[in-house]
């Protein structure tokens, strides 16, 4: 019976694709004739599991997948590029047969996505093919909106880190105005779906909401700026390392992007954020420690710091974060974004078993010196120990990861990813790697967070004297990365410290070559301490 249904679907698709109106496609299945893959969604009979069949059609063998995972098919008028958005039609189908078909504009999103074969996309829903007006709709139980992301998750070996981390954040943090805005969320929700683009099977994506005024429930612009939203895109003002003058005719300022209000150009005014940045960078200790909580929500600052450090998120203290304010009289708060370089992964998806060091920026560098009885450090210690018993522990996180992994495995996601992208293979050892990493990371944080105030992450390396070079470090100055070449393969630990003696990053490896990414580091002079086979070498490295 299954084969009969499949043959009907294939036959109809083969002879009727051109004759059908684009907005009349059923959307319940997709066919890739090059990769010989058919993916269909639909509610399975009770007790039935998702399955795969090999089928011979017209002398060719196709892989036929059937699951209850949603299916998204996209057809565009031309190739999808970074900008401008290209017109097309999107069909979003769930297993119950509900299909939503919309005109949309599509473009590639994300800087890193440009270099990968599997692209991430931004989807803007249009009222018609002109794109003159936007159109809201709700997909797969998510909010109603006209702006969506399709995340490729290319640099996530298990295709789950970003999703699980966002769910963990929303378990952990509640917006301070939640009672006034019950629909507001401090993060984004994500739903997995199979995706076809112009009849090419692209694998499994995460359809995600966007971080914006609607998601956060910020007060609307009414001629006066009330709720505001900025996005940090790198070092500079977002890391409190520079304070150039702003220009209110521009929607960017020193690696900040103005997100909301966006009703008109006259709504842009960087003065308030500039003043806060100036306060953090230049206020005296007495002024800073007595007044910072009146400008930035202290509970949010604590939760964000503990969350990012529990993940050891490599790229979320100046880049990939949002700064928001609910209304004019509210304090600022941080919200995370793009949580893929976490839990022992670098930004390119490679494993970096780095469990020591504290993620920070100029704001947190000062907060972690707040040694008052009810200051940041004391409050963060109390909050950390509460969370260790509930959410921030290996058992809870691995339960979330395992449940998500099992769901993806049962639905055949990893098999389909391999068919779409043959270089991809799932490695169950990644679960063991993550579990061990969490154990080591929390062991480190237990000692560090509960240490005396003013000591977090601070270690002073002792240089060794002698002419023998164990390690070659280049380039110096460095811009994007520091390359480290050891004389021979050996167990090595490399630690990078800033000028205050704070441990910024550490790496362990057994290879002859190691790369330390620096794009999220502030400009300045760093101390690189390499320990190889019981010997130590100290180098000064300039990051530009």
Q: Which residues does each PLM region occupy?
A:
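C-terminal outer-membrane/trafficking sorting elements
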Residues: 18, 465-474, 478-544
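Short beta-strand/loop motifs in extracellular/secreted proteins, especially
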Residues: 88, 119-121, 490-495
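Middle-to-C-terminal accessory/interaction subdomains
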Residues: 102-104, 110-112, 116-117, 262-318, ...
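Regulatory N- and C-terminal appendages and interdomain linkers associated
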Residues: 20-107, 395, 399-402, 407-457
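Bacterial Sec-dependent N-terminal signal peptides
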Residues: 1-21, 485
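Residue-level detector of functionally pivotal "anchor" positions at catalytic/ligand-binding pockets or at interdomain
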Residues: 450-474
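Internal "kinase-insert"/substrate-recognition segments embedded within catalytic cores
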Residues: 127-132, 136-155, 159, 171, ...
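Conserved oxyanion/phosphate-binding beta-strand-loop segments in alpha/beta enzyme cores
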Residues: 92, 99-152
């Amino acid at each position: 019976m299954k084969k009969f249904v499949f043959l009907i679907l294939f036959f109809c698709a083969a002879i009727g694709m051109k004759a059908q109106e684009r907005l009349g496609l059923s959307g319940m299945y997709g066919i890739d004739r090059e990769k010989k893959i058919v993916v269909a969604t639909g509610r399975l009979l009770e007790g039935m599991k998702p399955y795969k069949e090999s089928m011979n059609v017209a002398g060719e063998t196709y892989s036929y997948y059937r699951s209850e995972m949603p299916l998204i098919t996209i057809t565009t008028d031309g190739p999808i590029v970074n900008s401008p958005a290209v017109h097309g039609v999107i069909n979003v189908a769930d297993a119950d047969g509900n299909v939503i078909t919309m005109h949309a504009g599509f473009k590639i999103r994300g800087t890193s996505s440009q270099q990968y074969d599997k692209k991430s996309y931004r989807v803007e829903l249009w009222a018609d093919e002109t794109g003159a007006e936007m159109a809201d709709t709700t997909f797969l139980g998510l909010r109603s909106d006209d702006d969506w992301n399709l995340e490729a998750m290319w640099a996530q070996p298990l295709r789950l880190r970003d999703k699980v981390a966002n769910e963990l954040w929303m378990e952990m943090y509640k917006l301070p105005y939640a009672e006034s805005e019950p629909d507001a969320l401090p993060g984004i929700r994500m739903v997995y779906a199979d995706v076809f683009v112009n009849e090419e099977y692209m694998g499994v994506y995460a359809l995600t909401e966007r971080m914006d005024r609607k998601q956060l429930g910020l007060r609307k612009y009414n001629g006066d700026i009330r709720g505001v939203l900025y996005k940090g895109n790198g070092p500079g003002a977002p890391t409190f390392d520079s304070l150039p003058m702003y220009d209110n005719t521009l929607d960017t300022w020193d690696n900040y992007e103005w997100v909301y209000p966006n009703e008109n150009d006259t709504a842009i005014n960087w003065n308030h954020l500039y003043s806060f940045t100036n306060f953090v960078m230049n206020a005296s200790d007495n002024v800073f420690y007595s007044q910072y909580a009146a400008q930035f929500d202290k509970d949010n600052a604590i939760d964000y710091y503990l969350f990012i450090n529990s993940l050891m998120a490599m790229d979320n203290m100046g880049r990939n974060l949002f700064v928001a304010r609910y209304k004019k009289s509210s304090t600022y708060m941080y919200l995370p974004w793009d949580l893929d370089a976490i839990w022992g992964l670098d930004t390119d998806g490679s494993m970096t078993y780095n469990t020591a060091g504290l993620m920070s920026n100029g704001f947190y560098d000062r907060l972690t010196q707040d040694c008052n009885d009810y200051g940041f450090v004391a409050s963060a210690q109390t909050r950390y120990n509460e969370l260790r018993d509930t959410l921030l522990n290996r058992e809870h996180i691995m339960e979330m990861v395992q449940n998500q992994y099992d769901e993806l495995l049962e639905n055949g996601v990893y098999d389909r990813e391999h068919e779409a992208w043959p270089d991809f293979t799932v490695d169950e050892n990644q679960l063991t790697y993550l579990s061990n990493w969490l154990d080591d990371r929390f062991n480190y944080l237990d000692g560090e967070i509960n240490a005396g105030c003013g000591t977090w992450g601070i270690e002073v390396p002792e240089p060794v004297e002698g002419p023998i070079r164990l390690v070659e470090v280049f380039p110096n100055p460095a811009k994007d990365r520091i390359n480290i070449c050891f004389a021979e393969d050996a167990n090595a630990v490399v630690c990078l410290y800033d000028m205050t003696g704070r441990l910024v990053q550490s790496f362990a490896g057994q290879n002859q070559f190691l790369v330390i990414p620096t794009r999220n580091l502030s400009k300045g002079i760093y101390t690189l301490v390499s320990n190889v086979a019981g010997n130590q070498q100290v180098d000064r490295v300039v990051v530009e």
